[in-house]
Amino acid sequence: MNKFWNWTKDLMTNTPELVLEGEIASETWWGDEITPKLFKDELNKHKGKDISVWINSPGGDVIAGSQIYTMLKEHTGKVNVKIDGLAASSASFIAMAGDTIQMSPTAMMMIHLPSTFDWGDKKDFQKTIARLEEIEKAIINAYELKTKLPRDELSKLMEDETWMNAYRAKELGFIDEVLYTNEEEKSQTGFDFSKKKVNACMQNSINQIPVSYTHLRAHETR
């Protein structure tokens, strides 16, 4: 079994963190009862708790991706997804399970059509094509729920093998926030607040000038 996930904890907030790193299941979860159960059992240890899910993955098995997506959607606490490197292929629709989805300004997301290897006669290939078309529709379901984009537009993005930086992903609705951008806003807010205090102090000093001057003139005329 290739365990592509592990659990850590944010030392500042004590929030459980699920880290998805590398290929999502090098072997398919189709017919595998052990690996999905292990993943679910570990997730259930944090039942009712808010969790963060860090993703850096090129994707992998669609069945595994589907099960992980569903387990995260079923989680009773809030799920905050953070993409720090790459969320491609099946990892991209796993990310859609987040109640909130954040992305590093240096990270990338990629969506494309499902693919497979097959052999046989023309009927076998026709069945494979039909199966891939249904898988595409299933993946679009996850994208559509998050982005609210039309299905034909999502299908076109997949056909084009679309790569998105964080700002493009936010523009299209795949994520909610680009990480660390609020720090600049907070800094600017702090600066504005300080500037207001300085201006207020200066104005107060100016307002005191006529009073002092009047007092001085009155003293001089005595």
Language-model features and meaning:
Residues 1-90, 98-217, 222:
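N-terminal organellar transit peptides
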